[in-house]
């Protein structure tokens, strides 16, 4: 009789048991551009890209979208790039509402230099946001509206097919992501026009 193949013998020369999974040790065979990323402590690292969106506070429309390789600083870099693309060289004061992940001294300083008031949720310790920002009524309003950012992402995953995309490579997935965000805006228009 022939020896039966078991899954244990498949990669006998490679054993990652007890080792940390990093982008240096693990790569996607289907999409080499995807990177391992942990969303929060206690969750597993997954091969993925990171989608970013810039919303306007009034109606929650996506005005800018981008997709990057996943890493710990991609969100802040993408936010600065989207702000510069949205209003290049603007001297009009803008505000940016964001969650605690954006409360970093370098990011807040870059926003202030770009004439943008950072309405970023404060970390409990070592926050870069001080009282001169939080005392204004606009800060509380931005914190209330920043939760709207989750709606287009939820729509993109459930309706837009972005939970697991068929496309490979950053450029193709980015194009699909931006198209999905535009479709989300179009899907919301009839409700807003009817109001």
Which role does the model predict for each range below?
Residues 139-195:
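Basic, amphipathic alpha-helical segments enriched in Lys/Arg and hydrophobic/aromatic residues
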Residues 116-126:
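RNase H-like polynucleotidyl transferase catalytic core
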Residues 57-59, 122, 157:
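Short, small-residue-rich loop/turn micro-motifs
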Residues 1-112, 184:
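Polybasic low-complexity intrinsically disordered regions
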Residues 65-68, 108-113, 123, 167-171, ...:
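Composition- and surface-driven signal marking solvent-exposed, interaction-prone regions
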Residues 127-134:
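Short, charged, surface-exposed secondary-structure boundary motifs
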Residues 96-99, 111, 118, 150-152, ...:
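Hydrophobic, well-ordered secondary-structure elements that form the walls
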Residues 107, 112-117, 180, 188:
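C-terminal, active-site-flanking charged/polar segments
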């Amino acid at each position: 009789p022939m020896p039966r193949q078991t899954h244990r013998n498949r990669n006998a020369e490679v054993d990652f048991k007890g080792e940390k999974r990093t982008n240096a040790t693990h790569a996607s065979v289907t999409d080499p551009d995807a990177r391992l990323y942990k969303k929060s402590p206690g969750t597993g690292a997954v091969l993925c890209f990171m989608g970013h969106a810039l919303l306007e506070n009034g109606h929650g429309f996506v005005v800018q979208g981008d997709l990057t390789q996943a890493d710990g600083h991609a969100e802040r870099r993408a936010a600065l790039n989207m702000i510069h693309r949205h209003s290049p060289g603007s001297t009009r004061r803008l505000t940016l509402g964001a969650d605690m992940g954006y409360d970093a001294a370098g990011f807040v300083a870059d926003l202030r230099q770009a004439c943008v008031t950072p309405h970023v949720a404060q970390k409990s310790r070592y926050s870069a946001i001080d009282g001169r920002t939080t005392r204004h009524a606009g800060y509380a309003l931005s914190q209330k509206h920043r939760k709207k950012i989750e709606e287009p992402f939820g729509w993109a995953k459930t309706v837009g097919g972005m939970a697991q995309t068929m496309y490979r490579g950053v450029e193709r997935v980015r194009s699909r992501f931006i198209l999905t965000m535009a479709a989300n805006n179009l899907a919301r228009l009839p409700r807003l026009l009817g109001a």
